[in-house]
């Protein structure tokens, strides 16, 4: 503003400076002259120039002559410099002192005229200058009536103000010498003030000064060069403000050039250096300011016309300069409508397809179209026209008044230049050609708009242009012999032109060429008839070619054609460059938008200041530090988890290796089968076959590979996980077995002979020895075979699922075979089959001896395997000797004995089966035998880790083994058989197949057994599992089986019992143990008559009082008026609506005999009217008139609307804050993204609503004629005027419809940018609250103690089946459901009591979890989703700007600045989104971990959202029961205190009154005072059927207190004189509750007894005094027992009520009475003791 105020100048600056009347006043006062104000202003200005001696010769020279301008405005015609006599002395009107110092201080002095008439005239001129006609007439009259002195004072003050203004202006003009001006112009660093001073100096300085500037300093050339430099600077700089200094400099330079040319010495310069002038001035024809264009137009007109008759060079130079403006960039207001803002944009050079003069005339036409709707008004005018005089110091009123005139002057100057250009053509052909070019450029349209201005001078110029055109056409007709009437040619009719040409070339040699040219033209255009764009392009090329040929002045036609073709090619190449430039413009415009956004962001940061920006950065750093710390914590946790996973991975590998080794052992045990023992040639051959050799070999390879992988993984993962002890031992043992097997393979068996055996053989006979040997061998073999048969028979009955072998014979699978024994058996069999040394021994005893030695070795190995829990029992049913095949080595007697033993074993097996079937008992396979196999099978086959089969204890007898038999030397050692019998697993008895389930157990048992087992279910969980195990459908194979299964299945569990009813209040709080509390009694009735001492009935309440007299008196006139029509007519009506007085009117029929009969209304109304009362009432009691809804104006009613009514109403409601703006202004505010639009959330939300942005087909069809397509390169005007639409429709059209291709993305982006910071703060706050809650729960020191107490007490209460290691949080809500035996206390009450009394430190958990209360109002899942949606929205906006709807700026509305608002904030928003996502992920991870820590499922959304609320609900319930417990304990404490207080004086009284022999009885009575009293009160209580009113109870209590007070008035020293008072106060102030809540059972019984006494008294009609003697009724022997009991009950009942209802004063009074009663009781005791 300061620069604008300082640097703005225009053509009228001097005249405006002296436009006030003070100059004329000064002139008239001093010279009595009638000079104009303008000349006086110049005189005063010239007198000031003496103060600057640098550019002056002497003062007399300046006084003798000066320069003046006849028309100060440069727009006025005939503006020229001339010498005039000033006719004024410098020293007379204004006293000045010469000084060489600048600035100069001068004194102001104005001489007063002697004539009063002169002062009067000067004063009237002053009033005219002040526009006194706008003042009120009264003020004007007062000013005219001022005295002469006051008028002169006002004149002098105005003159002094004008003088000071001139002085300030003179000081602002830094006048330099010509050389100094030349120096600053050459340096191109001249300021606006200096250029303005140069322009003033060229007008006011003497001719010598101007000559020095022009000839000596080449000032005109410097000005032209500087003007060119300014034009280049405008293009290079991104100037958007029309009021920039650079435009002021351009105006000042053109004004200076015009001043130079206005003098002859300057005008002569254009003859020599016209090129510099023309090129500089022609560029100003495209200036955004009208004043600049007008000056440039006048200058060019002068250059062509000045002595141009003999110099056509300047004329052609001007034409070439006009042709070159198409190649120059320009600045203009970039908006397709008339309500664009004051924002400039740089336009690139126009393409070569623009016609000659087209760009220049387009600028003129645009200026005319931008004028206002009304004459001399800027309403509807564009900023281009409004800013025509930007930089001037004229007043706004002056500029507005001259706006239309200066636009007309610009049009006149333009039309004059056109006429000069056309008129200076060499001949009529050139002139006709120039006119054709002007018409092609749009001159006809401009002339039509010029005529609409209605200016006479402009109309004359247009008429002159048309006359010259007609003259040239006539000359053309004359020269071409077209002047005959038959050959009249119309140059605007193409058909007439072609006919004329055809007539001229017909029957000549040119006929063929003409016809061929027309035919080719027709054929060329006929092919492109369907494509108007191509047709236009081809015709343009053809016209350009013909035009270039016709414009070339040369004799050679070939040269003309070549020149035309070259120009055409140049133009076409320029078109390609232009298209490429357009693509570049899109890119650079985007870059410019981003740069502008960055600049604005930097400006915003700078505006924040150092402190603000540092604080912002510190906040960002804190947030990042917090996120980094959390990531570090997560990283540490992940490292720990990774280490754990590595360890777990290695342990799983070890487990897998262990399982494979165990599986290999089982396979090896199960594969040994003695398939055949053949006797061949006295040799024994044992063949052992396996069915899983390949699987075993593969397992061995896998074991070795796993061991190698294990070592490799340890090295790669950097872990050192040692194998388990079992795996290590198994590895070592298997290695030992392999080594020993290799040793056995390499052993050379030799003949072995025992010395003792040899001796026995020598002593005995050969027959006996042979018999003994055979017998011993038979017995040993039979024993071995019997043991093996028994084992095989037992193992056959064990149901073991087979291994899934894809092929091969079906075989049983065993998992507890004797690993080492079977393995070595296999090795021995292989050795025996392969060794020739063994096969040569035919002696059975020798074979058995070798076998015995091997088995002894196996025994040693088995002892080493005892610590590894390996069962060496043989379970293969096929692993037995085939005695038929071994017949060659066994005697017949042994075979027979073996068969007998086998038959006996078969009988025993059948007997055992029958017994087992009768007992219906089962025994499942041994867990040790099944554990390894089932674990492997469940893991790799069934997909399970562990399946535990129930263990059922069977009482069936087991098969007894044989005793060890004595053997000979050749038999096996009995120790081996003993050990073998102990180690081989004994099979269970065989069960009936129909009675087995899938686990090998019975399907069911008898109902008795089931019931018996149900009884013992709490002691054995395994039995429950067996009874409730599901039965597979695959096991039911027959109807019988199915029936038995159905009938004998375990019954389903009984349904759960219904939930218990809500617990009643405990007795101490007024609850009842037997039933619910009775409803509260009705309110008490009024006291009966006999208690009031009168038999009269209480009178009813009096009626409402009548209205006040004051109100009635005020309502007199209106009432009478309404009752009488004539009186109503006489009362004047108010001018505006008043507040209504609401009263109860008296009917007209009741007025006759009433107070209101014949009131004196007429006189009173007249009196009130005369006194102004009614007027005052209108001011005081004016009613607020309801605002009328804004009705549509007449022009709005005539407008069109297409929107639905509800949509239009939404526009009106949401945009009501912008009703003061017009439609165009509001649309521009939205497009410019003004702050008041962006800060209004209702507007942004409304713009983004789906029903607003979704355009239906009907709306699209209706709005299409009014729409503007901004997606095309050239924006065309709509078919219909959008002003015909109503306001909502117009806004909808301009925003939602015209911008529908990117409106949704635009609105979404603005919403994100505006709200991202606020949303971020909100989400971070919620996340941090969640973090605090999670940390408080996780780090709580006392919460775990509370839960452990609950768990311990609960486990103590539950039976063994419901024992728990922990409980879920949902169980906390059930703690208050379980109540005690009397329903007076819940489990939570007891837990709180235990914690408060035994573990008070645990109560701190409430404070530790206090921060959880804030989280309960939030949904955890919604917060997480909101954070993700926040980041997703910002990402979508970035995508829209990169590759989406917001990526192409060329498709935006020209005034849209959405990127300028979005781009600066987007990087920060992206950073915020990343930080928010990181914090949300961390928070959710911690929250999920906490849920897992408490055994909850984090994937369940309902559980997740209610997780924190479970803690808060528990705390609320805990606080509630804590308050209830404390309240109950306080009541009990008060009760105990009162009880002790009552018992103490009673014991002393009883000791005084009773004899010594009754001491025992009195002591007993002292201990049972309360009990006896309660018994008596119960006996006096009414029956259940009797109902007593609470009102009666209260009344009786009151009467009892009154009677006691009367009775105890005389005996103050009695112990009972205090209790009634205390009771009275308790009744009156405290005990007003009729319900039983909070009262004890003793209180209720006392109430019942009182009610019974009241009924008795009412029936007997006794006086109140009888009722008061409560002691006589209750206990005649002890008169104070009833009063004491009553007082006790009152105090108990009022203990908790008084705290809430009594005031401080009443509470203090009650405490004082209590102390008094205690003191009185103590005094009584002391008296009694003294009397004794």
From Swiss-Prot:
It is found in: Cytoplasm, Cytoskeleton; Bud neck; Bud tip; Cell septum. Gene3D superfamilies: 6.10.30.50, Formin, FH2 domain (1.20.58.2220), Formin, FH3 diaphanous domain (1.10.238.150), Leucine-rich Repeat Variant (1.25.10.10). Its main location: cytoplasm. Required for the assembly of F-actin structures, such as actin cables and stress fibers. Nucleates actin filaments. Binds to the barbed end of the actin filament and acts as a leaky capper, slowing both polymerization and depolymerization. Protects the growing actin fiber from tight capping proteins and so increases the time of elongation and the total amount of F-actin. May organize microtubules by mediating spindle positioning and movement in the budding process. Required for the maintenance of polarized hyphal growth. Residues 52-73, 992-1009, 1029-1049, 1547-1557, 1609-1629 have a biased composition (Polar residues). It comes from Candida albicans (strain SC5314 / ATCC MYA-2876). GO terms for biological process: actin cortical patch localization; actin filament bundle assembly; cellular bud site selection; cellular response to starvation; establishment or maintenance of cell polarity; filamentous growth; filamentous growth of a population of unicellular organisms; filamentous growth of a population of unicellular organisms in response to biotic stimulus. InterPro entries: Actin_filament_regulator, ARM-like, ARM-type_fold, DAD_dom, FH2_Formin, FH2_Formin_sf, FH3_dom, GBD/FH3_dom. Residues 1-81, 331-350, 754-814, 948-974, 992-1136, 1541-1569, 1601-1714 are annotated as: Disordered. GO terms for cellular component: cell septum; cellular bud neck; cellular bud neck contractile ring; cellular bud tip; hyphal tip; incipient cellular bud site; mating projection tip; mitotic actomyosin contractile ring. This is Formin BNI1. Residues 578-672, 724-747, 773-924, 1419-1442, 1518-1544 form a coiled coil. Residues 12-51, 1109-1118 have a biased composition (Low complexity). Residues 1563-1595 form the DAD domain. Pfam families: Drf_FH3, Drf_GBD, FH2. Residues 1050-1067, 1077-1089, 1099-1108 have a biased composition (Pro residues). One of its GO terms (molecular function) is actin filament binding.
């Amino acid at each position: 503003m300061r620069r604008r105020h300082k640097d703005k100048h225009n053509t009228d600056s001097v005249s405006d400076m002296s436009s006030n009347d003070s100059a004329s006043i000064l002139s008239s006062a001093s010279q009595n002259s009638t000079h104009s104000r303008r000349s006086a202003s110049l005189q005063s200005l010239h007198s000031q120039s003496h103060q600057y001696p640098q550019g002056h010769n002497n003062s007399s020279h300046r006084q003798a002559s000066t320069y003046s301008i006849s028309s100060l405005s440069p727009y006025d015609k005939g503006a020229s410099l001339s010498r005039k006599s000033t006719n004024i002395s410098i020293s007379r009107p204004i006293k000045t002192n010469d000084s060489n110092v600048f600035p100069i201080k001068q004194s102001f002095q104005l001489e007063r005229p002697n004539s009063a008439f002169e002062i009067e005239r000067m004063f009237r001129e002053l009033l005219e200058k002040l526009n006194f006609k706008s003042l009120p007439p009264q003020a004007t009259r007062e000013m005219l009536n001022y005295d002469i002195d006051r008028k002169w004072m006002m004149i002098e003050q105005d003159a002094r103000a004008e003088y000071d203004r001139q002085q300030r202006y003179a000081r602002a003009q830094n006048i330099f010498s010509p050389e100094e001006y030349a120096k600053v112009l050459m340096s191109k660093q001249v300021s606006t003030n200096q250029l303005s001073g140069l322009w003033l100096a060229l007008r006011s300085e003497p001719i010598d000064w101007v000559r020095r500037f022009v000839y000596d300093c080449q000032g005109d050339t410097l000005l032209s060069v500087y003007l060119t430099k300014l034009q280049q600077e405008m293009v290079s700089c991104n100037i958007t403000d029309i009021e920039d200094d650079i435009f002021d400099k351009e105006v000042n330079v053109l004004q200076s050039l015009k001043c130079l040319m206005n003098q002859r010495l300057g005008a002569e310069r254009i003859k020599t250096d016209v090129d510099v002038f023309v090129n500089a001035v022609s560029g100003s024809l495209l200036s955004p300011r009208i004043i600049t264009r007008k000056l440039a137009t006048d200058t060019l007109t002068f250059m062509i016309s000045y002595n141009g008759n003999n110099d056509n060079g300047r004329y052609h130079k001007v034409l070439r300069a006009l042709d070159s403006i198409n190649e120059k960039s320009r600045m203009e207001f970039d908006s397709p409508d008339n309500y664009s803002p004051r924002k400039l944009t740089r336009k690139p050079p126009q393409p070569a397809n623009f016609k000659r003069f087209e760009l220049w005339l387009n600028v003129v036409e645009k200026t005319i179209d931008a004028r206002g709707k009304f004459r001399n008004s800027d309403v509807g005018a564009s900023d281009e026209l409004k800013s025509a005089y930007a930089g001037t110091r004229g007043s706004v009123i002056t500029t507005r008044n001259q706006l239309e005139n200066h636009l007309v002057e610009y049009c006149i100057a333009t039309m004059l230049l056109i006429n000069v250009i056309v008129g200076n053509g060499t001949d009529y052909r050139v002139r006709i050609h120039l006119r054709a070019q002007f018409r092609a450029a749009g001159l006809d349209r401009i002339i039509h708009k010029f005529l609409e201005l209605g200016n006479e001078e402009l109309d004359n110029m247009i008429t002159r242009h048309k006359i010259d055109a007609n003259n040239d056409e006539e000359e053309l007709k004359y020269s071409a012999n077209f002047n005959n009437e038959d050959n009249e040619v119309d140059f605007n009719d193409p058909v007439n032109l072609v006919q004329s040409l055809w007539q001229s070339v017909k029957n000549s040699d040119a006929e063929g060429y003409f016809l061929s040219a027309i035919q080719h033209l027709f054929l060329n255009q006929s092919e492109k008839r369907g494509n108007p764009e191509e047709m236009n392009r081809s015709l343009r090329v053809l016209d350009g070619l013909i035009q270039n040929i016709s414009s070339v002045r040369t004799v050679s036609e070939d040269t003309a054609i070549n020149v035309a073709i070259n120009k055409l090619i140049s133009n076409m190449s320029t078109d390609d460059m232009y298209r490429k430039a357009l693509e570049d413009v899109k890119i650079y415009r985007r870059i410019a938008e981003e740069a502008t956004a960055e600049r604005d962001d930097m400006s915003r940061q700078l505006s924040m200041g150092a402190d603000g920006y540092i604080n912002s950065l510190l906040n960002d750093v804190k947030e990042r530090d917090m996120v980094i710390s959390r990531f570090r914590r997560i990283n540490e946790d992940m490292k720990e988890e990774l280490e754990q996973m590595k360890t777990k991975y290695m342990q799983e590998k070890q487990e897998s290796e262990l399982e494979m080794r165990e599986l290999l052992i089982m396979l090896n045990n199960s594969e040994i089968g003695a398939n055949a023992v053949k006797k061949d040639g006295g040799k024994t051959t044992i063949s052992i076959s396996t069915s899983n050799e390949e699987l075993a070999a593969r397992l061995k390879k896998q074991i070795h590979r796993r061991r190698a992988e294990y070592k490799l993984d340890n090295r790669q993962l950097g872990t050192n996980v040692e194998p388990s002890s079992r795996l290590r031992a198994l590895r070592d043992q298997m290695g030992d077995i392999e080594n020993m097997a290799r040793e056995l393979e390499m052993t050379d068996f030799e003949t072995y002979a025992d010395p003792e055996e040899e001796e026995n053989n020598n002593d005995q006979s050969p027959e006996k020895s042979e018999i003994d040997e055979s017998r011993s061998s038979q017995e040993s073999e039979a024993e071995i075979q019997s043991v093996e048969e028994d084992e095989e028979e037992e193992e056959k009955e064990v149901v073991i699922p087979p291994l899934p072998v894809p092929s091969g014979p079906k075989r049983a699978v065993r998992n507890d075979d004797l690993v080492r024994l079977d393995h070595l058996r296999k090795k021995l069999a292989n050795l025996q089959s392969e060794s020739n040394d063994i096969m040569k021994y035919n002696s059975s005893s020798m074979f058995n001896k070798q076998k015995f030695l091997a088995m002894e070795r196996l025994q040693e190995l088995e002892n080493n395997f005892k610590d590894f829990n390996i069962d060496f029992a043989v379970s293969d049913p096929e692993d037995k000797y085939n005695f038929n095949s071994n017949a060659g080595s066994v005697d017949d007697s042994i075979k027979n004995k073996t068969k007998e033993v086998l038959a006996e074993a078969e009988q025993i097996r059948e007997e055992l089966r029958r017994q087992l079937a009768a007992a219906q008992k089962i025994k499942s396979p041994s867990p040790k035998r099944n554990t390894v196999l089932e674990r492997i099978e469940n893991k790799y086959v069934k997909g399970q880790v562990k399946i535990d089969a129930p263990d059922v204890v069977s009482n069936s007898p087991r098969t007894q083994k044989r005793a060890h038999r004595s053997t000979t030397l050749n038999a096996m050692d009995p120790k081996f058989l003993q050990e073998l019998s102990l180690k081989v697993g004994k099979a269970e008895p065989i069960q009936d197949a129909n009675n087995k389930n899938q686990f090998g157990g019975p399907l069911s048992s008898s109902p008795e057994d089931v019931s018996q087992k149900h009884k013992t279910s709490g002691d054995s969980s395994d039995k429950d599992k067996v009874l409730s195990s599901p039965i597979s459908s695959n096991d039911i194979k027959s109807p019988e089986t199915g029936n038995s299964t159905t009938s004998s299945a375990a019954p389903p569990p009984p349904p759960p019992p219904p939930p218990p009813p809500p617990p009643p209040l405990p007795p101490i709080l007024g609850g009842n143990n037997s039933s619910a509390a009775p409803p509260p009694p009705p309110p008490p009735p009024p006291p009966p008559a006999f208690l009031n001492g009168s038999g009269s009935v209480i009178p009813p309440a009096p009626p409402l009082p009548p209205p006040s007299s004051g109100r009635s008196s005020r309502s007199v006139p209106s009432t009478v008026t309404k009752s009488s029509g004539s009186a109503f007519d006489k009362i004047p009506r108010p001018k505006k609506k008043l507040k209504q007085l609401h009263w109860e009117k008296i009917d007209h029929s009741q007025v006759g005999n009433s107070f209101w009969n014949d009131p004196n209304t007429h006189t009173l109304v007249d009196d009130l009217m005369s006194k102004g009362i009614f007027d005052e009432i209108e001011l005081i009691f004016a009613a607020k008139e309801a605002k009328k809804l804004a009705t549509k104006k007449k022009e709005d009613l005539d407008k069109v609307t297409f929107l639905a009514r509800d949509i239009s109403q939404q526009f009106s409601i949401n945009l009501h804050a912008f009703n003061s703006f017009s439609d165009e202004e509001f649309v521009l505010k939205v497009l410019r993204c003004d702050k008041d639009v962006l800060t209004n959330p209702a507007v942004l939300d409304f713009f983004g609503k789906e029903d607003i942005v979704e355009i239906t087909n009907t709306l699209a069809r209706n709005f299409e004629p009014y729409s503007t397509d901004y997606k095309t390169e050239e924006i065309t005007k709509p078919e219909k005027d959008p002003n015909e639409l109503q306001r909502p429709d117009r806004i909808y059209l301009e925003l939602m419809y015209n911008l529908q291709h990117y409106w949704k993305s635009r609105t979404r982006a603005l919403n994100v940018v505006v709200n991202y910071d606020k949303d971020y703060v909100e989400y971070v706050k919620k996340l941090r609250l969640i973090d605090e809650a999670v940390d408080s729960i996780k780090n709580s020191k006392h919460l775990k103690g509370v839960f452990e107490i609950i768990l311990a007490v609960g486990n103590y209460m539950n039976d063994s089946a419901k024992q728990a290691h922990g409980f879920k949080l949902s169980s906390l809500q059930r703690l208050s459901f379980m109540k005690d035996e009397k329903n007076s206390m819940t489990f939570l009450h007891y837990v709180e009591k235990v914690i408060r009394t035994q573990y008070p430190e645990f109560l701190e958990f409430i404070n530790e979890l206090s921060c959880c209360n804030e989280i309960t109002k939030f949904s955890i899942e919604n917060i997480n989703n909101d954070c993700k949606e926040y980041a997703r929205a910002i990402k979508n906006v970035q995508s829209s700007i990169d590759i989406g709807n917001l990526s192409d700026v060329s498709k935006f509305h020209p005034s849209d600045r959405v990127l300028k608002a979005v781009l600066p904030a987007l990087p920060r928003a992206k950073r915020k989104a990343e930080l928010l996502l990181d914090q949300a992920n961390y928070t959710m991870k911690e929250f999920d971990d906490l849920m897992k820590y408490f055994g909850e499922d984090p994937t369940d959304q309902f559980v997740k959202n209610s997780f924190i609320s479970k803690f808060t609900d528990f705390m609320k319930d805990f606080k509630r029961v804590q308050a209830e417990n404390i309240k109950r304990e306080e009541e009990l404490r008060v009760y105990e205190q009162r009880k002790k207080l009552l018992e103490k004086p009673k014991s002393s009284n009883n000791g005084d009154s009773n004899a010594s022999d009754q001491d025992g009885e009195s002591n007993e009575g002292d201990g049972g005072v309360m009990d006896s009293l309660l018994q008596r009160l119960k006996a006096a209580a009414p029956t259940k059927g009797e109902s007593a009113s609470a009102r009666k109870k209260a009344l009786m209590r009151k009467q009892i207190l009154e009677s006691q007070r009367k009775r105890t008035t005389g005996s103050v020293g009695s112990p009972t004189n205090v209790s009634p008072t205390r009771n009275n106060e308790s009744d009156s102030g405290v005990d007003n509750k009729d319900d039983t809540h909070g009262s004890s059972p003793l209180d209720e019984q006392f109430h019942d007894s009182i009610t019974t006494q009241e009924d008795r008294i009412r029936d007997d009609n006794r006086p109140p005094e009888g009722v008061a003697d409560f002691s006589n009724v209750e206990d005649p022997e002890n008169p104070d027992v009833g009063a004491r009991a009553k007082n006790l009950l009152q105090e108990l009942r009022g203990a908790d009520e008084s705290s809430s209802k009594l005031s401080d004063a009443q509470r203090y009074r009650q405490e004082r009475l209590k102390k008094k009663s205690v003191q009185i009781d103590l005094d009584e005791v002391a008296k009694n003791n003294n009397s004794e």
